[in-house]
């Protein structure tokens, strides 16, 4: 049994990819597969504690209920109040109006999570046949065929590219009964894609990813959208209002993401809260940095909200813009890959500087697990760069410094009282000051 296998256990719950939704929809946003509802409807800082074991190819998501049945509702009891004296944060839990899930490839009803993605049996089988059979397809048209339930058989090439695009993991397919291996198959990159954003079938020379890294890839949340208030005049207030609302919605997503980090849910509730309260801004900034890698001197706060130097100056964010851009340039120089990014993000959470950890040994084990996962990845995939792990880890202090600047800036915005802030963002901001 590998070191990854020993630590995975039941902490790797399922993760449902989501679509953007209006922040005004509150808790109803969940019924549209969206994590984008603000925190006000859910009562502030919450950790969804109930997890179940789920691998890359999981059982059906709704045991004991038909996919077309009535949405199930489940309430959770209030849990312990916050650790920090300056921020008595109460946890409230609610899982509201869970809809039936759709296959991310063709839109049919999903039967479960297959190879890391909610998908139907037909697309699951198609992806498996393609990988195990070492099959290459050719599109008779322009590689842009629409893949729907009715038309999914019309073009195998575009269907396979769609499987890759939504994130199906090659590591989930068993190859031990097939001679040879897979041919290198690169999906066509769309206009917004880049080497930083694509997840491709790798050449046979590359070794399989460790399970930890594979699970972190699966746990990655879907894109969020800023959706700036349309009626508000352009200026610093609109920019700050947009970013504060976006940060609040991202925090809701981060809390759900954290419990899918192998080993995190086994920590005590108090330690989970302490780590999140300490590292949330680092995680937010690391996301901005990674999204900004394909761009020159621009920060991608969200897919629909990109700020250059002039925009940042008008918003009063020039100092923060320059600090984050310094990180972007550093990661760009390292040519950081998505597998490294997701592991560094988990490490930023586990390596937080919280003074309120109850079980230091348990947190240390989580840190060791993630350090080992990063090191194993570098040894197997980037063995020609023996010092790469150290170089990546040395970016974390600068990330922490940048996060501290961001916290101070938004706390000063809070004190001015000119920009509305949602409950969760306020609580987490006060916990850091």
Swiss-Prot record:
Residues 28-38 have a biased composition (Low complexity). InterPro entries: Est_rcpt/est-rel_rcp, NHR-like_dom_sf, Nucl_hrmn_rcpt_lig-bd, Nuclear_hormone_rcpt_NR3, Nuclear_hrmn_rcpt, Oest-rel_rcp, Znf_hrmn_rcpt, Znf_NHR/GATA. Acetylated by PCAF/KAT2 (in vitro). Keywords: Acetylation, Chromosome, Cytoplasm, Deafness, Disease variant, DNA-binding, Metal-binding, Non-syndromic deafness, Nucleus, Receptor, Transcription, Transcription regulation, Zinc, Zinc-finger. GO terms for molecular function: cis-regulatory region sequence-specific DNA binding; DNA-binding transcription activator activity, RNA polymerase II-specific; DNA-binding transcription factor activity; DNA-binding transcription factor activity, RNA polymerase II-specific; estrogen response element binding; nuclear receptor activity; nuclear steroid receptor activity; RNA polymerase II cis-regulatory region sequence-specific DNA binding. A zinc finger (NR C4-type) spans 103-123, 139-163. Residues 203-433 are annotated as: Essential for ESRRB transcriptional activity and interaction with NCOA3. Residues 93-211 are annotated as: Interaction with NANOG. The record marks 185 as: Important for stabilizing DNA-binding. SMART domains: HOLI, ZnF_C4. PANTHER family: KNIRPS-RELATED PROTEIN-RELATED (PTHR48092). It is linked to Deafness, autosomal recessive, 35: A form of non-syndromic deafness characterized by non-progressive, prelingual hearing loss. Binds DNA as a monomer. Interacts with NR0B1; represses ESRRB activity at the GATA6 promoter. Interacts with NANOG; reciprocally modulates their transcriptional activities and activates POU5F1 expression. Interacts with NCOA3; mediates the interaction between ESRRB and RNA polymerase II complexes and allows NCOA3 corecruitment to ESRRB, KLF4, NANOG, and SOX2 enhancer regions to trigger ESRRB-dependent gene activation involved in self-renewal and pluripotency. Interacts with KDM1A; co-occupes the core set of ESRRB targets including ELF5 and EOMES. This is Steroid hormone receptor ERR2. It comes from Homo sapiens (Human). The gene is ESRRB.
